[in-house]
């Protein structure tokens, strides 16, 4: 652990951190179900479509605690990807495109892909 910290500090101080930085991207969805049974096939399949692209759930079905504004539409889902390209490739993939109509039939949704802030890539000794 100390070695990794020293190496990360060295890269940061020497200006090499930007070369090691990765910029994640996030798929964010607001979903309001109109048919709870109809969304089940989508829910059962969606993870297998984004795992090959390095995606992982950060939030799945969270009920938002709205503090200001109009609030979210239904439940929230956030999937993190290693890059914007990975997120876009997943969204455009045949596997995901095949199940999107299931979500459309089961309710109302708004979806976004946004780029996050750069993160320092893990350093392995």
Label every model-predicted segment.
Residues 97-113:
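Short arginine-rich
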């Amino acid at each position: 652990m100390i070695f990794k910290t020293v190496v990360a500090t060295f890269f940061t101080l020497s200006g090499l951190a930007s070369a090691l930085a990765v910029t994640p991207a996030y798929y964010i969805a607001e979903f309001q179900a109109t048919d709870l049974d109809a969304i089940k096939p989508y829910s059962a399949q969606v993870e297998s479509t984004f795992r090959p692209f390095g995606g992982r759930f950060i939030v799945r079905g969270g009920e938002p605690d709205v503090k200001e504004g109009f609030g979210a539409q239904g439940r929230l889902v956030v999937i993190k990807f290693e890059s914007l390209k990975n997120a876009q490739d997943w969204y455009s993939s045949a596997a995901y495109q095949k199940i999107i109509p299931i979500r459309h039939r089961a309710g109302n949704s708004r979806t976004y892909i946004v780029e996050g802030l750069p993160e320092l890539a893990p350093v392995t000794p």
